[in-house]
Amino acid sequence: MPGAAAAAAAAAAAMLPAQEAAKLYHTNYVRNSRAIGVLWAIFTICFAIVNVVCFIQPYWIGDGVDTPQAGYFGLFHYCIGNGFSRELTCRGSFTDFSTLPSGAFKAASFFIGLSMMLIIACIICFTLFFFCNTATVYKICAWMQLTSAACLVLGCMIFPDGWDSDEVKRMCGEKTDKYTLGACSVRWAYILAIIGILDALILSFLAFVLGNRQDSLMAEELKAENKVLLSQYSLE
């Protein structure tokens, strides 16, 4: 019996360094996951700002050197000159779709607006981290970000379908047609929206990875607790 007790004590002493190493690895793992999660949250907020800017700003397409009229178009707001002065006449409102020059512009406004609402809802869901399972919240946000990216893709693809409208042709020339800008050019808000698609896809992928890591982290914690209980039971 004394020999068995001594052997058990020696085995327990040998296990201590391994347990300490596992605990250190676990601590670093948790710290790194939290740091990545904070960065993910910050970039999600940045993406939301980009989305709002793309939705509001009327600089998706604009005039060029050879355009008949000066002006610029956004999703739902546009300004065109009259050819006699440098003043621009502005029209369009998101609350009044009848003022939009094309059905494609209406559809694009809807999808980009939906994308904006989804990413804002995703940020609101950050409060769920205080009440719900962390992995579940990450996965909810990931699906919302992925859907937001899909809406952005639809909006950016549908928007050029409205370039054949009379108002756009008045600014860009008669050579303007669907997906052909004529004498006009793509402006920064459209480019920013396309970059936002890539941003949203990366954020959603990262959220899925963080959610899965949280699941594996919980499984490792459960295994560690079971090992401690088994070692204590064997010592007894």
From Swiss-Prot:
The topology of this chain with respect to the membrane is: Multi-pass membrane protein
Q: What is its main location?
A: membrane
Query: From what organism does this protein derive?
Result: Homo sapiens (Human)
Q: Which InterPro entries match?
A: LHFPL
Where in the cell is the protein located? Answer: Membrane
Q: Name one Pfam family in it.
A: L_HMGIC_fpl
Which keywords label this protein? Answer: Membrane, Transmembrane, Transmembrane helix
Coiled-coil ranges per UniProt: none
- Is Transmembrane given among the entry's keywords? yes
The signal peptide, as residue positions, is none
Query: Its GO CC terms?
Result: plasma membrane
Q: What is this protein called?
A: LHFPL tetraspan subfamily member 3 protein
Top-level taxonomy: Eukaryota, Metazoa, Chordata, Craniata, Vertebrata
Single GO biological process annotation from the record: sensory perception of sound
Family to which this protein belongs: Belongs to the LHFP family.
Transmembrane regions: 36-56, 110-130, 140-160, 191-211
